[in-house]
Design a protein with these regions (language model features):
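Beta-strand-rich ligand-recognition modules
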Residues: 1, 139-151, 155, 259-301, ...
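Beta-strand-centric surfaces of beta-sandwich/beta-rich domains
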Residues: 1-363, 387, 409
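Periplasmic c-type cytochrome electron-transfer domains
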Residues: 368
Length: 490
């Protein structure tokens, strides 16, 4: 199928933009979207911001009132043994101010971990680090009268501990707290702990993206929270792209068109607050701003690592100070392991992998850049183009649960596609297809998933790549400069 975006009044010739975040799946068990589905339940759900809609189980409520937290001290709100899940968090600070939003921290420990799984200003958990206006999202929110809530499920299997810390120089009054605990049992094999990345404190970095988060292990990112201050108020500060790199790929898998488009708004941050169920922003006109986006239907799964950054201006040419954190469900284990690589610029690597290409083979030198944070670093290599096929042999782990192929190529030409064969058998679940093109930042890394039924129990694979034309003219645009091989090891 395909996706087509059109403006509301395209006959006027007005410009516009948009972004599509998508997941690819095998056909089995997947129903194609038709546009005729009934959305009533979803619409009603999204209208109930501020209400806990996820937790249907019997809840045990742990409530406390009128607690004073002295400067530099902490209080424990929950210390629970056994198995369960936090179903909701609510806090009321009657004397909240902007400084408290940064100085009152929450720490959450699951299963007696030495380091907290959640550790950040409470404002991050509520989705608003500035506090100028109410921002009520579906799963978290903040009101200017001092209320915070968060409804992300937070499973644990042995122990849960929640602490509030006052890092300010004055006492803070916690008027009310409510922690709802469910006895839901989650399977440990495919459930992650609810976590956040180490809080990225407010700072400017020159010439590169602000590195908001770097995660190691396996999981899926479900929310982003970023705050920005420019050198003075009312300066346009919206042009920096969000860029997300997954599993070590040099090409960002998610890249926004400016900062505000990441939370699904346009034309900067001129009219705070702007809120929809899955995201929005607070602040003052243009800056400072504090934005939140939930990645629920479009979560970002990762199997070895995830990096999240944001530009300062159009090309890191502006003085901006960012802070923030990423929320995710994660496990410590890295389940995607590199087992081999084929470098087509190395005669030794070509020979070792028995690589060959057939049919009008052309080798072309390319001096260009990757998209993203390192788009000013020149990378030099050669690409191979051919009309018939290429083939090569790679090593894998016999204990694999599937294999990922990663290709390095020149994306100057649009709509590259190929059929993939493993040991003579075609991978029929999908075509290797990349729609993108960039004539300026031409180096591209993209991935192809090979299901375990083609790879399990094997120590090596014979790969065959057969280009397919996606154009009316029949032009073949496929090319390759390098392959990396990764195994899923659950």
């Amino acid at each position: 199928t395909d996706v087509k975006l059109e403006g509301y009044e395209r006959t006027k010739g007005e410009g516009g933009w948009g972004h599509v975040v998508y997941h690819t799946y095998a056909d089995n068990g997947i129903k194609t979207f038709t546009g005729k589905e009934n959305y009533d339940t979803l619409i009603q759900l999204w209208k109930k911001q501020g209400s806990n809609l996820l937790c249907k189980d019997q809840l045990a409520y742990h409530r406390k009132s009128e607690q004073k937290i002295n400067a530099g001290e902490s209080i424990t709100l929950l210390d629970e043994k056994g198995e369960g899940a936090i179903g909701s968090l609510k806090f009321y600070f009657p004397e909240i101010n902007e400084q408290h939003l940064q100085d009152v921290w929450i720490h959450m420990f699951w299963d007696a971990h030495q380091q907290p799984d959640i550790s950040c200003p409470l404002a991050c958990l509520g989705g608003n680090s500035l506090g100028f206006h109410d921002t009520n999202y579906l799963l978290s929110g903040y009101n200017t009268d001092g209320w915070f809530y968060n409804y992300f499920p937070m499973p644990y299997w042995k122990h849960a501990k929640i602490i509030i810390e006052n890092r300010s120089g004055v006492p803070v009054s916690l008027g009310f707290s409510e922690i709802a605990v469910s006895r839901s049992v989650y399977p440990t094999s495919n459930t992650g702990y609810f976590r956040n990345t180490p809080y990225y404190t407010r700072k400017h970095v020159a010439g590169i993206d602000s590195p908001i988060a770097a995660i190691q292990g396996r999981g899926k990112m479900v929310a982003a929270h970023v705050t920005c201050h420019a050198e003075r108020s009312h300066i346009i500060s919206c042009e920096g792209d969000v860029r997300v790199y997954i599993d070590g790929k040099r090409t960002p898998q998610v890249e926004s068109d400016g900062s505000e488009s990441y939370v699904c708004y346009g034309w900067g941050f001129p009219t705070p607050p702007e809120v929809h169920p899955m995201g929005g922003y607070d602040g003052l006109s243009d800056n400072p701003w504090s934005m939140t986006r939930f990645c629920i239907g479009d979560s970002y799964p990762f199997y070895s690592e995830l990096k999240f950054g944001i530009e300062s201006g159009e090309y890191n040419n502006q003085y901006l100070e960012h802070s923030g954190t990423i929320f995710y469900y994660g496990q410590d284990k890295n389940v995607l392991v590199k087992t081999d690589s084929l470098d087509l610029n190395s005669s030794r690597s070509i020979k070792r992998h028995s690589y060959k290409a057939m049919g009008n083979v052309r080798r072309t030198k390319l001096e260009s850049f990757f998209e993203g944070n390192e788009d000013r670093i020149l990378y030099v290599g050669e690409t191979v183009r051919f009309e018939s096929f290429s083939s090569f042999r790679v090593n894998i782990s016999s204990q694999n649960e599937g294999v990922r192929l990663r290709r390095l190529s020149d994306q100057n030409d649009v709509r590259q596609a190929a059929r993939v064969f493993v040991d003579g058998e075609e991978v029929t679940e999908r075509l290797w297809y990349v729609a993108d093109s960039n004539p300026y930042k031409r180096w591209l890394e993209d991935d192809f998933e090979i299901p375990a039924k083609y790879t399990k129990g094997k120590k090596s694979l014979n790969i065959r790549i057969v280009p397919v034309s996606m154009s009316k003219e029949g032009k073949n645009t496929w090319n390759e400069a390098e392959y990396q091989v990764f195994c899923y090891n659950n």
